[in-house]
Structure formats: C-alpha cells, structure tokens
Amino acid sequence: MRILWVVVCVVLIFPFCVQAQRGWHAGLKGGISVPKLRAPSSSTNSYSDGFQTVVGPQAGLIAEYRFNSLFSLQSEFNYSTQGGEKNGDQRIRTTDFKAYIPVGVNLPQYLYGNFNNKISLVYLELPLMAKFSFPLSNKYRLAVYGGPYAGYLIKAEGEASGKSKIYTDPQKTTELKYNGFALGEVDFTRKEDIIDQLSKNNFGLQGGTSIEYATGRINYFFAVGGNYGFKRLQKDPNFGNNKTGGLAISLGLTTKL
C-alpha cells in the first residue's frame, strides 16, 4: 500500500514538475579545439600517417528544449577548427618536380623529403544531441550529451615550411638528380588553398559532459567534449585516407526564453 501511494504521488506531481522545467533555452559558447587527422590503423599511406594534434578556436550558438529537469534535446550551430600537423618525413608527388626530370627517365610515383606540413580546416557544424542532466546541489548540475552531427567545410589550407633534399626512395638513400647532379636542398615553404582536394560535407558523432551553475534564468557551464568524423577527408584516396576528430573545451551560458 505504501508503494502504491508513492506511485500515485509521483504520477500526480510529475506533470507539474515537467511543466515547470520544460521550455526553450538559448545560449552561446566559446573555447578551443584540439583536433587531429586520424588515419586507419592499418594505413601504409604516408600521406595519411603521422599527423599530430593542433590547437584552434571553436565557438557556437545553442538552442535547447527541456522536456523536464532531467532530459532535453540540444542543437548547436558551431564554428569548428579541424586539422593536424606532421613534421619530418613527407611524401611528395613526382609530378611536382617534372621540370627537373629528363624525358625518358622513369621514377617512382612519389618522392620523399623532410620538412613540416600543417593542414588547417574550418567547418560549420550542426549537431543534434540528447542531453541528460543530474543535480549535484541546488545550484550545480552534471550533464552528459551526445548525438549525430553534419558539417560543411568552408576553409582548407595547407602550409609547408622548411628545406629538404629530395630522395627517390622512402629510406632516403638516393637523391633526386638533374643532369647527373644531386638537386640539393629545396625550399618547401608555402601556403595554398586545398579546399578543392577535399570533401566539403562531413558527418559523425559529437558528445561530451559539462558542469552547469544556475543563477536565476541564466545557466553558466564548463564543457569538455569532442567529435568523431566518419567520412574520408580526401577526394582522392591516393592522397590520403584521413578523417576528422578531436577534443573541444568550452565555456558558455544559456538563458530561458
């Protein structure tokens, strides 16, 4: 009988709690992104391998509909930086040096060198996430959230720096020669737009956790999360098989509308 009364009380009170908590909230956030270009674990393509993390800005607008104090749906419109850097061993297309290669000389498809290479990407992303919130005290709540996202590439730059000798083998034992003489060091320092080489659309999963502090109609939060892209970045798989992903750390606020 006691259990029955508890159930009746919950059934009677719950709708009022839901009504009190439900509604639209809007906000904004900003912070840093720590992305890395991922390559398959089985990859033997040196275009894909060896990228390390970089740091860039990220910011977004938030729209959240709260069904009750525990569950909500959250959508965002984010400016997200992605990319990576690789220093040291690099693979180079032989066609980039065709002016130095005498007619009739057969060379491998790729040449090799040592310099620095950085890929900088900017996406506009639209995630839709389920969010679960748990009270820690009267003012603080812990939230976890996750769901799919779609992204659109708006900027892509490749930046190289450094000088290197050019080799015809990955072990770097044989230098590229022109008229019988080694070509010597070549300056690779340059920046170029590479957006036409990449797929503009992307999709994947995004999620994270946050600590929220409520004061009046405004909630302040600190969030740590990340995203994991599913689509290959390069249009031509011969030039790599990387996917996006990384960590995001942000501060923000939302307010009840």
PLM features per residue range, with description:
Residues K36-V54, Q82-V122, L153-K200, R232-T244:
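Extracellular/periplasm-exposed beta-strand and loop segments of Gram-negative cell-envelope proteins
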Residues Q74, S80, S120-V122, F132-R141, ...:
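Acidic/histidine-enriched, beta-strand-rich ligand/metal-binding domains
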Residues R22-S72:
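Start-of-domain marker
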Residues L28-I32, P57-Y65, F77-Y79, L126-F132, ...:
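Residues on the lipid-exposed face of transmembrane beta-strands in outer-membrane beta-barrel proteins
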Residues Q21, N68, P135-K139, A214-I218, ...:
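Outer-membrane beta-barrel channels and translocator barrels
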Residues K177-A182, Q197-L198, N202, G207-L257:
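Predominantly the C-terminal beta-signal and adjacent terminal strand-loop region
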Residues M1-K29, L251-L257:
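Bacterial Sec-dependent N-terminal signal peptides
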Residues W24, T53-P57, S120-L126, Y140, ...:
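Residues that define the transmembrane beta-barrel architecture of outer-membrane proteins
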